[in-house]
Swiss-Prot record:
Pfam families: Ribosomal_L9_C, Ribosomal_L9_N. Binds to the 23S rRNA. This is Large ribosomal subunit protein bL9. Transmembrane segments: none annotated.
Amino acid sequence: MNVILLDKIANLGNLGDQVAVKAGYARNFLLPQGKAVVANTANTEVFEARRAELEAKLVADLTAANERAEKINALESIVIASKAGDEGKLFGSIGNRDIADAVTAAGVELAKSEVRLPLGALRTTGEFEVEVQVHTEVKAIVKLSVVAED
């Protein structure tokens, strides 16, 4: 199924690209989310008429994401206290939600889906640098300090 992308989508294309995708992906994800329209003559004409508006929206989203990333990078080290054993091993773990809640409490809104922990949840005390993907093109780093609770 051919679709016209209304947004930049990782591993697929940019705004305005006409791409061939599987019908299920288009019907179940791209079309309901408003990220694409079916590529036919009528939709192509409508898209070309709205292209400038969509590009301006994309630029505005990118600018807002850059501003959020700067705020996140400007944060001091965020401290999360958790119960831990004598050797620094946590009873439990620090996951995406815990990190997102701590950053939000520090004053910058952050969703748990934006936090990237490629090695899984944090299970020891110490200093960590956690990557946050604010936008498909914008990433930020959060300095995190996990300490043992008294």
